Amino acid sequence: MTDISKDRFLDALEGVGRPVATAEQIARELDCTQATAADALAALAADDEVERANVEPDPVVWYPRDWLELTDRERIVPFPDRREIIVDQPSQLTRAQLSRVAHLTDTTRTGSYRYEVRAEDVWAAPFDSLSDLVAAITELLPRDCPTLIEWVREQWTRATRFRLRTHDDGYVVLEAATDSLLGNVAEQKLDDDVLRAPISDTEAWVAAEQVAPLKRTLYEAGYPVRDDRDLESGEPLAVDLHLDLRPYQQDWVDRFEDASAGVLVGPPGSGKTVAAMGALESVGGETLVLVPSRELATQWREELLANTSLTGDQIGEYHGGEKRVRPVTIATYQTAGMDRHRHVFDDREWGLIVYDEVHHIPAEVARRSASLQSKHRLGLTATPVREDDKEADIYTLVGRPIGTDWDALFDAGFVAEPEVEIRYVPWRDDDDRYEYAAASGHTRRRLAAENPAKEAEIEHLVDQHGDTQALVFVDYLSQGERIAERLDAPFVNGETPHSRRETHFDQFRTGALDALVVSRIGDEGIDLPDAEFAVVASGLGGSRRQGAQRAGRTMRPGSQSLLFVLATRGTEEEDHARSRMRHLSTKGVRVTESDASHSP
């Protein structure tokens, strides 16, 4: 008799699409005879695993003893024509796998997730071959989806139709797969000054200053360009890394070496900065590092001094507080984006440009980056998502994503998987509720964000986790001041002098502070390794990037990290909170929801 376990029976029910089935239907799903299925089902019934019912004159039907076993099971339903995948109750592994090939578009409170497979997802999928990508998709889906797979094959092929290379004489060549693509796509789409002259029926000479516009134009036309040019290594700079890279970090560096440009995508705490130092060692040329803040510039300097052979006189910072250009220069995006400081891009023969928190790249810096296409380029981010959806800026100006499954990092213990909980807080009283109902626009959103009842909930959570340092994020200064006073903690915001910021950050790192309240300046890569417990009191609308960054402040190795996201019950803030956590859901992080435990 063929062995049919309860799990195989439940799988068969899903294939049938009904909660009850006959032995004939089960046999058809499991590819066995009806007699074999009937005997196996009878054995399961004898073990109290399934139930049977006579529904004469119809045949006997079989169903699970516990109906919840059906509703709580993971179920994946593909819609190939729409290129959508709906998943109910997905496991952490399933969500992590889906994040490599699809884009999460919606979630529900009942545990359903909707993914869309976009052309950009296929182009940026972290697979070395089409067969590997197809295998990953087919392994996820419960049935064959030939139309979806065929579309994926077409998109993968489109990403190989155009290639940039360096001619033996040193100039840039655009190479098309066919003469039709060169004539009917490239020559038709590109401005007249991009292609200087034809070389053959499938090749053209590219103006060096037009490489970035070429890549952007063809990307928007549906043909991402493979960039195989020989890039400049700049003025030589010998650098030795004093750390051993983790296996996935070495893989990042190896893949960057092969491509000469790309974006490292990994959770905070995974060591992207260390991997970037490995890339600096590999390129062996003078390097410009661009960062969002002065604090990050200082951290980069300290990390380089501690972990490489670079000396203090080889590293310069370029921002509002200091302006020194050295073989390795760390500049803020804000300063580098100013017209009067544009010379920082040209002062030295840079061999490598590093864009830390690359999703923050301002338009001014992006435009100037268009002239840096001959340099090695490396972006670092926990999420390449930009809320204005300008992913093409990052893809074409810096490079395609180079990533590692978050799930693998969690399992290996390199990064702490946060426990994320969205807590819905009621209004403090009817007066607050009525004021919200009468308001509109920004005032309405701010009232929900600054709901006074959140302050009591935060105090309760901090008391409940009293043996752990607490980090509290706010978006509004007045709210931050009230919470800081309630917790007897410092409040660090954009108005806090840099010297005092560093004092408070050092106090938090060393354990001298039990709690710290921060505004948006704490969203980025400021290193707070002991922040194992965090509360988000208010957030930037539905910003997925901000959600990932704030959760990332707790994602450090060797810790049990907790993140609570507060949202006012019965307001649009509920949807915003779920949206902010959506990116974490795509990466395999389990996000739960509950009501506030401390009522006003």
Swiss-Prot record:
EC code: 5.6.2.4
SUPFAM superfamilies cross-referenced by the UniProt entry: P-loop containing nucleoside triphosphate hydrolases
GO molecular function: ATP binding; ATP hydrolysis activity; catalytic activity, acting on DNA; DNA binding; helicase activity
Pfam family membership, one: ERCC3_RAD25_C
Source domain of life: Archaea
PANTHER family assigned: GENERAL TRANSCRIPTION AND DNA REPAIR FACTOR IIH HELICASE SUBUNIT XPB, RAD25/XP-B DNA REPAIR HELICASE
Protein name: Putative DNA 3'-5' helicase Rad25
Source organism per UniProt: Halobacterium salinarum (strain ATCC 700922 / JCM 11081 / NRC-1) (Halobacterium halobium)
